[in-house]
């Protein structure tokens, strides 16, 4: 109904105070007899009286609404709550008041609506080989050229008045989602033609999508919520975000929001979940249907005048779908809200609630008008609606040539193509009436007219006083931040485990590092260790926030959705998120820094300590903002993570420790000016050394014969020392070694603060401007080379197909034609007294209770029941897929017990379509056929059978298409067909299980799947299928029914009968009501047994079944089937291989699985190019950062740290491998292990082997990119061993890469999540870093940690790599590295140093110097002597290489063992 004013609103129906009953003291209109009353007095008294009566009336409304009694129909907690009555009362309370603002209503008129995008209906799959070929195309498209226009909507027109509901119908790909997004103003990624006309009640599309965003909303079918928030908090947040400035009844905002939350939860039947987590696919929470209702409730709480709902009933049963539509109807009738709803498989009761319907056919409008007139319109065109088909299904069938039925005599008159349907619509009188109505609407509500002013005033009245006039948000920016802070606190409170785990983990990391540098001495021997420790502390503080990239991407979809709802600015959420992270950052900084600072004996003075804490904290905040800005700047997590490794490497290399400033190459030295870490490191180094003098720990010369030398004849053996002094100035040391000066200390702090502010501003701006990547839509992707074939097929239109009248609808075909060559089944699967018990919280619960039944070849059996009845559980038990609990009873095949080959001889079509995204349809089928078909078939026969399956499932047109992911690859129907095809390709000898094959599909796709199942049964397949509340026509497709009640008890097992008469007769005979004419037997059946929402029964139907003659007949038949054990059977064979667990031998499994994994890597260029960037890119960066390094003391130290930084690549490789393995494992454990496709050993070994192969290639490239630019080959020229030592370096790098691969698999093999394995890798990486001998050699380690040095694989990696690349070569000192002192009188420097150099080595710059000349002494003259400082021996290089291979082997076998120990089921409990 159209509601344009408040005059036709209903009242609450409650009694209001009588105007005659006025409280004492009130003025009256009548006067005393002797009182003289003027006209002005009467006017004044009348005005006061009206005001007070109105106030009493409002108070009455408010008290009735917000203070309703316990059993009031307005109390959402009451069992008698009436949603429609509450809505009327709420309307009166909110809008019918003197100080209230008028309600906002929005209709929408659209004409010449053309929407298009740029792309292609087909694309080719990128691989490592062809990805580079796309670069020119991508560049050309980015510059605006080479784009192919794809039209999505063509000349759509319509009018939806305020308070009306529009039903949008069409199969997937018809443009329904695009239409709803366009109407809601969410056109990101879409292009609306400039000539398109849209009028929102006088408001233009630009105004609606900017100043009034949130007044027209689009709700997608995807559920995006914070999983750890409770349902109550999620909806309370939504209610608060849109709560008006003036609250009726004098309530606080919090009370108002809680009341609305309780009401909306009561409306959608989720009141019981108020304290339950929302959850998601990985976090346990409410059920899928309840989560969908949370999504609906969240959007509804905004009370937007125009609401667009895209398949929001997906996952809901028909009763809840109808209830959803009824709630929208109430909103429309009471508040004048306009709703546009795209709905799949709409029940008739839901369809009847709509005012108008729009039907789209491949983007063409073929009808718009009254919902009750739509069927008649298409019947006039010559189409016939079957008697039991719903109107919505009939309208959708117009878009399918195989489904629509043409009346006799209309064969050559009925339209066939989308264009013909659209043309007939344009010529219809209904369209002319529509155009006239649009013209009238546009005249009454002109753009930028008075309606816009009234709408803006109403919206302004709701917004905060501090909010801008043209802002779409209700709350002020401060209010948004406060609200988001509250939510962040709730998230933290609900799940503090991650935060606490990080705190504890970081604290233990600090303890470990502090123990390595425990109680450093206060002399010069601690110089290197102080620098190394401060470097580690700076990195720990700076990179503590690196995982915030992942955190931001986890919630990005949610933030963008709620920003579109106009709940808050994305920047407000970003600011609140940062503020809420500060306590953790401060606590973490305090724990880590206090532990490291004082345990290691850094400068124990108040001023330096607090300055260090100040620098560490500010640097941590700067880097946190950097990572947050980088995450908000990118569109996908791959874009964020891929370059992050290079960025982190640059930040580490150009800190000033690994490469001192004077050694930085000019082409890259600018990096340090942009690096907050370098400013922080300089500041803390100056803070540690400034103003201090350190006693010298060793002198040159010293030892026997030098005990009595004067102070001028010796010098401290460290950089910055001067002869004649026993102490070294800290300022001189940091200036000589690093080029740092004290005047930079506070300057650096200011720079860090400025960087933090600048990065924060950048982050907040990008959150507002940069949106995440959206799906390209359902685009078929082919292998390069076959894409042109697909494009040609795309050109074929409906006119090339036979006419609709010549194609009998598969839907109504009584006997589909059998497909020649498809495997038929002859064995009967039967079960008796099956029970299933599981332990939940130490209590045994029975899930299945004495279930009987059988499946015979050529029959289609439906398994139905209420949610929680155990339908899927029964399938799992019958298919031997349960891994916990106790199963009792018997499951037999032809009277024989099942053997170990049973699982591979049955097909199980899961509800989730799980496939490897990179394979083609044909490859997926061939993989199943080659590994699961019995060995008696040759490879050629198996592949030939695959082609027959392709034809059977009508997949020939897309047999070479890539599976992809939903949205970019196969659509929902094609994915479901592939799921069924994978099971058929295995030639199941026994039967086929299907779990909810039509769940979430539109009616057309559901019919297509049912046609397929019926075709399979006609080809001799035995099928058991779970299905949830099917339509009447779909239900009639089944032959038999197994109906379960709560607790897994059987209610009925037997024939359904023609028109479900057999089934209905059974219930009527046993006390159930008859099925009304035109009712759906499936829904009626559930109502009879009390399984439908709101239904109730006093009859114990499971007990009725046990006492029925039908049950006795079932028992007799089961007894007969047991006798089949003495007869020949297809499951009995003399071939031992037919009883084996797997059809293919282990070498064949390993070969096929390895080939597929290798193929997956090749077809995932993002992974391999990321690996290349990580390894080769990092190696080039390191190589040229240390380009042709010289063999000075500092130069050698730089090269040692070059190897140390190279270990960073190893750790990053481990992080990269882990999630890829999890993807493979999910598919294997969810489907392929259950169906016995191949063994777990083949799975683990093939994944490790393929990683070995790709990492070998990476090792070759990495070696070339690192070894030669650094110039390490020059060290081997002195011993004429360039080839042998270069080969050894390559072999060590190769072994290192294989170690990274095997270690990653060791970590993830037995662990459930990639996050946990990555956390373990992080801890292990820090341990291996710390104890490899570079930061502190074994002589400097506490005795407790020596074992860690010995068992650390990085120890032998570093030792082997440094000895092979640096060892046994001459070295020299730089000018600032020589130690200068005076020789004794009458002696040359050579004579004076002869004895010392014989023991300590080194060389003199001028051994003949004497007298006033100073001796210039270099402590080392050979690299092997230098390496001994790190306990590295050149002679052990081959031993170190061999030990690396030992680690690789141990890791590999450890991964296999851990997978078996933690992931492989060891057997089931069975009685």
Curated annotation (Swiss-Prot):
* UniProt: ATP binding residues: 865-872
User: Entry's SMART domains?
Assistant: AAA
Which GO molecular function terms does the record list? ABC-type transporter activity; ATP binding; ATP hydrolysis activity
Q: Which residues form the ABC transporter domain?
A: 133-387, 829-1071
Q: Which domain of life is it from?
A: Eukaryota
Known regulation of its activity is:
The efflux inhibitor FK506 impairs the transport activity.
Which residues carry attached sugars according to the database record? 4, 71, 311, 519, 842, 1386, 1422, 1429
Q: How does the UniProt record describe the way this protein sits in the membrane?
A: Multi-pass membrane protein
Per its record, the protein catalyses:
fluconazole(in) + ATP + H2O = fluconazole(out) + ADP + phosphate + H(+); itraconazole(in) + ATP + H2O = itraconazole(out) + ADP + phosphate + H(+)
Query: CDD domains in the record, alphabetically?
Result: ABCG_PDR_domain2
Principal subcellular localization: membrane
Keyword presence, Oxidoreductase: no
Q: Which family does it belong to?
A: Belongs to the ABC transporter superfamily. ABCG family. PDR (TC 3.A.1.205) subfamily.
Quote the PANTHER family the UniProt record gives: ATP-BINDING CASSETTE TRANSPORTER
Q: What is this protein called?
A: ABC multidrug transporter F
């Amino acid at each position: 109904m159209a509601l344009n004013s408040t005059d036709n609103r209903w009242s609450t129906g409650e009694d209001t105070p009588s105007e005659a009953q006025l409280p004492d003291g009130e003025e009256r209109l009548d006067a005393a007899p002797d009182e003289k009353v003027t006209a002005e007095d009467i006017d004044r008294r009348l005005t006061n009286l009206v005001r007070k009566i109105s106030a009493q009336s409002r108070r009455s409304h408010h008290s009735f609404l917000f203070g309703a009694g316990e059993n009031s129909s307005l109390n959402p907690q009451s069992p008698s709550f009436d949603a429609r009555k509450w809505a009327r009362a709420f309307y009166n309370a909110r809008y019918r008041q003197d100080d209230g603002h008028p309600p906002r209503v929005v209709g929408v008129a659209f004409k010449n609506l053309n929407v298009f995008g740029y792309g292609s209906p087909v694309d080719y799959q990128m691989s490592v080989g062809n990805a580079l070929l796309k670069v020119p195309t991508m560049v050309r498209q980015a510059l605006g050229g080479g784009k192919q226009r794809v039209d999505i909507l063509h000349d759509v027109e319509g009018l939806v008045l305020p308070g009306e509901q529009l039903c949008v119908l069409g199969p997937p790909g018809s443009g329904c989602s695009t239409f709803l997004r366009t109407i809601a103003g969410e056109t990101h990624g879409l292009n609306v033609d400039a000539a398109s006309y849209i009028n929102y009640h006088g408001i233009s599309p630009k105004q609606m999508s900017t100043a009034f965003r949130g007044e027209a909303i689009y709700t997608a079918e995807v559920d995006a919520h914070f999983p750890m928030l409770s349902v109550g908090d999620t909806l309370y947040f939504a209610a608060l975000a849109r709560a008006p400035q003036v609250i009726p009844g004098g309530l606080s905002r919090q009370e108002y929001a809680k009341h609305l939350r309780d009401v909306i939860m009561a409306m959608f039947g989720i009141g019981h979940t108020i304290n339950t987590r929302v959850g998601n696919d990985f976090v346990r929470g409410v059920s899928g249907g309840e989560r969908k209702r949370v999504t609906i409730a969240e959007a509804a709480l905004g009370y937007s005048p125009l609401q667009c709902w895209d398949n929001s009933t997906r996952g809901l049963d028909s009763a809840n779908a109808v209830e959803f539509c009824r709630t929208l109807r109430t909103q429309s009738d009471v508040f004048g809200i306009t709703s546009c709803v795209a709905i799949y498989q709409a029940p008739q009761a839901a369809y009847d609630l709509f005012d108008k319907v729009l039907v789209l056919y491949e983007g063409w409008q073929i009808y718009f008008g009254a919902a009750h007139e739509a069927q008649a319109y298409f019947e006039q065109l010559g189409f016939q609606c079957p008697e039991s088909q719903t109107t919505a299904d009939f309208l959708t069938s117009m878009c399918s040539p195989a489904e629509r039925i043409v009346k006799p005599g209309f064969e050559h008159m009925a339209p066939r193509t989308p264009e013909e349907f659209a043309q007939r619509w344009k010529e219809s009188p209904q369209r002319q009436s529509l155009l006239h109505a649009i013209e009238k609407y546009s005249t009454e509500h002109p753009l930028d007219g008075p309606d816009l002013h009234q709408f803006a005033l109403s919206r302004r009245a709701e917004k905060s006083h501090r909010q801008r006039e043209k802002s779409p948000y209700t709350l002020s920016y401060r209010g948004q931040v406060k609200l988001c802070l509250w939510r962040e606190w709730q998230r933290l409170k609900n799940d503090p485990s991650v935060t606490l785990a990080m705190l504890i983990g970081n604290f233990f990391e600090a303890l470990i590092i502090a123990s390595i540098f425990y109680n450093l001495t206060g002399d010069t021997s601690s110089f290197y260790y102080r620098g190394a420790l401060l470097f580690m502390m700076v990195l720990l503080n700076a990179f503590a926030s690196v995982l915030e990239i992942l955190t931001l991407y986890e919630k990005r979809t949610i933030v963008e959705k709620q920003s579109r709802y106009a709940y808050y600015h994305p920047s407000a959420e970003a600011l609140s998120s940062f503020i809420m992270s500060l306590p953790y950052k401060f606590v973490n900084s305090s724990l880590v820094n206090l532990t490291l600072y004082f345990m290691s004996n850094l400068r124990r003075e108040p001023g330096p300590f607090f300055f260090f804490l100040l620098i560490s904290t500010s640097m941590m905040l700067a880097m946190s903002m950097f990572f947050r800005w980088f995450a908000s700047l990118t569109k996908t997590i791959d874009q964020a993570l891929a370059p992050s490794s290079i960025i982190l490497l640059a930040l580490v290399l150009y800190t000033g420790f690994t490469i001192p400033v004077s050694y930085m190459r000019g082409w890259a030295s600018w990096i340090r000016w942009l690096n907050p870490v370098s400013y922080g490191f300089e500041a803390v180094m100056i803070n540690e050394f400034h103003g201090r003098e350190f006693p010298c720990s060793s002198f040159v010369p010293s030892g026997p014969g030098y005990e009595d030398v004067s102070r001028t004849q010796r010098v401290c053996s460290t950089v910055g020392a001067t002869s004649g002094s026993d102490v070294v100035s800290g300022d001189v040391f940091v200036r000589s070694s690093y080029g740092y000066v004290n005047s930079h200390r506070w300057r650096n702090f200011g720079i860090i603060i400025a960087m933090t502010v600048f990065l924060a501003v950048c982050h907040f701006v990008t959150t507002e401007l940069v949106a995440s990547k959206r799906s390209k839509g359902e685009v078929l992707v082919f292998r390069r080379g076959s894409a042109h074939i697909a494009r040609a097929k795309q050109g074929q239109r409906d006119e090339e197909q036979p006419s609709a009248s010549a194609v009998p609808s598969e839907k109504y075909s009584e006997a589909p034609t059998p497909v020649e060559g498809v495997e038929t089944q002859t064995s009967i699967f039967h079960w008796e007294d099956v029970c299933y018990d599981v332990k939940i919280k130490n209590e045994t619960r029975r899930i299945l209770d004495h279930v009987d039944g059988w499946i015979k070849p050529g029959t289609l059996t439906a398994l139905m029941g209420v949610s929680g009845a155990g339908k899927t559980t029964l399938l799992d038990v019958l298919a031997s897929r349960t891994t916990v609990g106790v199963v009792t009873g018997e499951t037999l095949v032809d009277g024989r017990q099942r053997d170990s080959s049973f699982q591979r001889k049955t097909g199980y079509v899961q509800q989730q379509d799980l496939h490897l995204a990179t394979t083609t349809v044909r490859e997926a089928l061939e993989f199943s056929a080659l590994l699961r078909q019995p060995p008696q078939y040759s490879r050629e026969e198996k592949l030939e059978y695959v082609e027959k399956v392709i034809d059977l499932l009508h997949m020939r047109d897309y047999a070479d298409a890539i599976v992809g992911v939903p949205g970019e690859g196969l659509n929902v129907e094609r994915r479901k067909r592939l799921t069924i095809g994978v099971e058929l390709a295995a030639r199941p000898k026994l039967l086929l299980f299907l779990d909810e094959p039509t769940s979430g599909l539109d009616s057309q796709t559901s019919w297509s799947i049912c046609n397929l199942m019926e075709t399979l049964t006609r080809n001799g397949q035995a099928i058991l299928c779970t299905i949830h509340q099917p339509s009447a026509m779909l239900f009639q497709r089944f032959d038999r029914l197994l109906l379960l009640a709560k607790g897994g008890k059987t209610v009925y097992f037997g024939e359904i009968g023609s028109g479900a008469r057999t089934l209905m007769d059974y219930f009527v005979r046993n006390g159930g009501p008859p099925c009304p004419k035109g009712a759906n037997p499936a829904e009626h059946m559930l109502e009879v047994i009390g399984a439908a929402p709101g239904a109730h029964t006093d009859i114990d139907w499971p007990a009725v079944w046990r006492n029925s003659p039908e049950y006795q007949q079932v028992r007799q038949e089961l007894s007969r089937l047991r006798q089949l054990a003495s007869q020949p059977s297809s499951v009995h064979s003399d071939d031992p291989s037919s009883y084996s667990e797997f059809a293919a031998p282990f070498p064949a499994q390993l070969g096929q699985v390895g080939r597929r994994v290798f193929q997956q890597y090749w077809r995932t260029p993002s992974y391999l190019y990321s690996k290349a960037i990580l390894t080769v890119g990092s190696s080039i960066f390191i190589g040229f950062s240390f380009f042709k390094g010289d063999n000075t003391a500092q130069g050698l130290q730089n090269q040692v740290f070059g190897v140390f930084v190279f270990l960073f690549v190893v750790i990053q490789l481990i992080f990269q491998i882990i999630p890829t393995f999890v993807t493979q494992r999910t598919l294997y454990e969810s489907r392929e292990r259950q169906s016995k496709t191949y063994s777990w050993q083949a799975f683990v070994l093939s994944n490790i082997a393929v990683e070995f192969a790709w990492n070998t290639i990476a090792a070759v490239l990495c070696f070339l990119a690192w070894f030669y630019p650094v110039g390490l080959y020059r060290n081997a020229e002195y011993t004429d061993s360039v080839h042998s030592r270069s080969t050894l370096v390559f072999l060590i790098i190769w072994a290192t890469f294989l170690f990274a691969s095997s270690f990653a698999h060791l970590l993830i093999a037995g662990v459930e999540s990639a996050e946990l394995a990555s956390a373990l890798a992080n801890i292990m990486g820090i341990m291996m870093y710390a104890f490899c001998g570079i930061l502190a050699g074994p002589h400097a380690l506490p005795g407790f940690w020596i074992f860690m040095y010995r068992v650390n694989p990085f120890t032998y990696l570093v030792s082997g790599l440094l000895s092979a690349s640096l060892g046994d070569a001459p070295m020299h000192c730089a000018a600032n590295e020589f130690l200068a002192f005076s020789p004794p009188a009458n002696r040359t420097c050579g004579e004076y140093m002869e004895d010392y150099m014989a023991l300590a080595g080194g060389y003199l710059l001028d051994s003949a110097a004497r007298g006033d000349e100073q001796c210039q002494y270099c402590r080392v003259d050979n690299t092997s002597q230098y390496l001994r400082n790190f306990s590295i021996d050149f002679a052990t290089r081959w031993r170190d290489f061999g030990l690396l291979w030992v680690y690789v082997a141990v890791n590999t076998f450890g991964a296999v063992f851990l997978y078996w120990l933690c992931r492989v089921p060891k057997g089931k409990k069975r009685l």
